[in-house]
C-alpha cells in the first residue's frame, strides 16, 4: 500500500447468519483497487456483520456505495431478528482519518457517501458524531432510538428529518447513520 491518503471505514451490516449474503456484502471490499479489507466478523446472536477496511478516499467511496447496494438488495429488516439494536440493513458507516487526511476530509467523505446512497438506494441517512448537523444527532443511541420498527414514525418529526434522502423509512432496508470520528 503506497497510498498517499488513507481513511479507515468500519461499516456495520444487519446480517450475521447467512454466509452467502455476508460474502456478497464483503465482495466489493475484496476486489476494489485502492481498498484493503483488513477484517470482518459476524455474530449470529446479534445478527450483525462488522467490516474493517482502509483505502484511498475515492476508492473507499466507490466500494462502500457498492456494498450498501448489495445490503439493500439482500437484507429485509422485516425478517431480521438479533440482540443488537439496529435501524438499517447498513446500520452505521464510520469514517476515521488515518494518514494524510483531516477530520474535515473524513466528514466530507461521509457526506458524499450519504448523498449517493440516499440518491441511488432511496435510503434516509442521518449524520452523527463529528458529521452531525445538529447537537441532538451527535450520539448514536439518540439517532437509533426506536430502531427499525419505530423509525417509520420518528422520521416524520421535524427534528428527525434525515440529512439526506427521503423523509420515510425504506420499507426493507430502514435507515443508515454515517459519521466521522477520531478513532474507534
Model-found features: residue ranges?
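Conserved small/polar residues in nucleotide/adenosyl-binding loops
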Residues: 182-184
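N-terminal glycine-rich anion-binding loops that anchor highly charged ligand groups
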Residues: 2, 25-50
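A generic structural motif
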Residues: 13-17, 54-60, 96-103
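Short, low-order "capping/linker" segments at domain edges
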Residues: 94-104, 108, 135-152
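A generic, well-ordered mixed alpha/beta core segment in the N-terminal half of proteins
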Residues: 62-131
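Acidic, His- and aromatic-enriched active-site or binding-groove loops in soluble protein domains
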Residues: 146-164
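Short, charge-patterned binding micro-sites
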Residues: 39-56, 83-98
Amino acid at each position: 500500500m503506497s497510498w498517499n491518503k488513507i481513511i479507515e471505514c468500519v461499516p456495520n451490516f444487519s446480517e450475521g447468519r447467512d454466509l452467502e449474503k455476508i460474502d456478497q456484502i464483503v465482495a466489493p471490499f475484496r476486489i476494489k483497487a485502492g481498498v484493503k479489507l483488513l477484517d470482518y466478523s459476524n455474530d449470529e446472536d446479534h445478527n450483525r456483520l462488522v467490516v474493517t477496511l482502509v483505502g484511498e478516499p475515492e476508492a473507499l467511496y466507490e466500494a462502500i456505495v457498492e456494498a450498501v447496494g448489495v445490503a439493500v438488495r439482500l437484507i429485509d429488516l422485516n425478517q431480521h431478528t438479533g440482540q443488537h439494536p439496529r435501524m438499517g440493513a447498513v446500520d452505521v458507516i464510520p469514517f476515521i482519518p488515518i494518514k494524510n487526511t483531516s477530520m474535515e476530509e473524513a466528514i466530507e467523505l461521509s457526506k458524499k457517501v450519504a448523498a449517493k446512497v440516499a440518491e441511488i438506494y432511496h435510503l434516509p441517512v442521518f449524520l452523527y458524531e463529528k458529521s452531525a448537523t445538529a447537537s441532538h444527532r451527535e450520539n448514536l443511541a439518540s439517532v437509533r432510538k426506536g430502531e427499525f420498527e419505530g423509525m417509520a414514525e420518528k422520521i416524520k418529526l421535524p427534528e428527525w428529518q434525515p440529512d439526506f434522502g427521503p423523509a420515510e423509512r425504506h420499507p426493507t432496508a430502514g435507515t443508515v447513520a454515517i459519521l466521522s470520528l477520531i478513532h474507534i
